[in-house]
Amino acid sequence: MSDQGFPRRQRLLTAGDYQHVFAHASFKVHGKGLLVLARPNALGYPRVGFVFSKKNVRRAVDRNRLKRLVRESFRLQSHRLPAVDIIVLARRGVDALDNATLHRQLHGMWRRLEKDVRKQSVASTPSP
């Protein structure tokens, strides 16, 4: 069976992990109702965490649906993502989007993040 799980090592688990990304976010990707913050890590694989507050997503059922969709989207795209720590933040109005729209939007956000990280790594690599 292929490695399609979502192991603990791919999650931001501690408050320190979150603080590190919030304090030193190198990349921001905006979408309708979502914001992705990311920072390179030295682990060799991407990790993700979520911030879906009651203020922005009122009902628990909607917060859980969003977490499930983002987690699944990340799981399917993680093999393409560079080694970064990612935080996905919900903004107001995201709970009004349907699942298909969210899935398309997340796919585009992962691609933009991948492109931005590649662009920065190429720019920071000195030429011979």
UniProtKB/Swiss-Prot annotation:
Give the residue range of the signal peptide.
Answer: none
Keywords in alphabetical order, please. Endonuclease, Hydrolase, Nuclease, RNA-binding, tRNA processing
This chain is encoded by the gene named rnpA
Q: Does the keyword Nuclease apply?
A: yes
EC number of the protein = 3.1.26.5
Q: Name one GO molecular function term.
A: tRNA binding
Q: Which family does it belong to?
A: Belongs to the RnpA family.
- Please indicate which superkingdom the organism of origin belongs to: Bacteria
Q: Biological process (GO) annotations? A: tRNA 5'-leader removal
Q: Which InterPro entries match?
A: Ribosomal_Su5_D2-typ_SF, Ribsml_uS5_D2-typ_fold_subgr, RNase_P, RNase_P_CS
Which cysteines form disulfides? none
> What functional role does this protein have?
RNaseP catalyzes the removal of the 5'-leader sequence from pre-tRNA to produce the mature 5'-terminus. It can also cleave other RNA substrates such as 4.5S RNA. The protein component plays an auxiliary but essential role in vivo by binding to the 5'-leader sequence and broadening the substrate specificity of the ribozyme.
Q: What is this protein called?
A: Ribonuclease P protein component
Keyword Hydrolase included in the entry's annotation: yes
Reactions the enzyme catalyzes: Endonucleolytic cleavage of RNA, removing 5'-extranucleotides from tRNA precursor
Give the quaternary structure: Consists of a catalytic RNA component (M1 or rnpB) and a protein subunit.
Matching SUPFAM superfamilies, A to Z? Ribosomal protein S5 domain 2-like
Give, as one word, the top-level EC class. Answer: hydrolase
Q: Which GO terms describe its cellular component?
A: ribonuclease P complex
